[in-house]
Amino acid sequence: MVIGSRILCNAALTKEIESKKKNPLNWGFLEWVYSSAIKEVNRIFPLIRLPNIPLRKLRSLRWEGVRTFNLGVWRKDFIAVNGFDESFQGWGHEDADLAVRLLKIGVKRKDGQFSLPVLHLWHQESSRTNEAENLRRLMARIDDKQTKASIGLNQYI
């Protein structure tokens, strides 16, 4: 699995992107610096490109920090773990659960920071009311042998 990074857009910039008034994909360096200075985006460091060096595999067995906003995984591996576990409700920890199960079947992590940035458009966050239960579910998953999602992809295919 390859984990990239993201640049968060604020609500105003998101609205301008959606209405096609702004297109950050065509921006030069100074436009990005300005956008960061006026807080339209949270950071610009992910735009820096670094070569494909061995450091990208340093955390190959770690699930911590894996977020699925910018994750690449082979289809066969995603199917092998039955995709996302839909027993996770609301916000939190479903991406870490997916990473844990992928690692359990032998998939290695490769960091794509400074290589694969994405723009993350602003949106309302999901409810965090079930975060504690989702965290408990994740901690149990780390300790068990289960590699397939309880409620997952197989219900759709």
Tell me the role of every PLM-derived stretch.
Residues T129-L153:
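Catalytic core of nucleotide-sugar-dependent glycosyltransferases
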Residues G65-N82, Q89-K108, Q113:
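A short, conserved alpha-helix in the catalytic core of glycosyltransferases
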Residues L61-E64, E86-F88, N154:
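Active-site rim elements
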Residues M1, N70-G72, V118:
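Conserved hydrophobic/aromatic beta-strand scaffold that supports enzyme active sites
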Residues L13-E18, Q124, N130-E133:
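Short aromatic-enriched loop/helix-cap "lid" or pocket-rim segments at secondary-structure transitions
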Residues C9, G112-T129:
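Active-site donor/metal-binding and catalytic loop motifs
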Residues S35-G72:
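A recurrent flexible, glycine/aromatic-enriched loop bordering the glycosyltransferase active site
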Residues M1-S36:
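Conserved donor NDP-sugar-binding/catalytic core segment of glycosyltransferases
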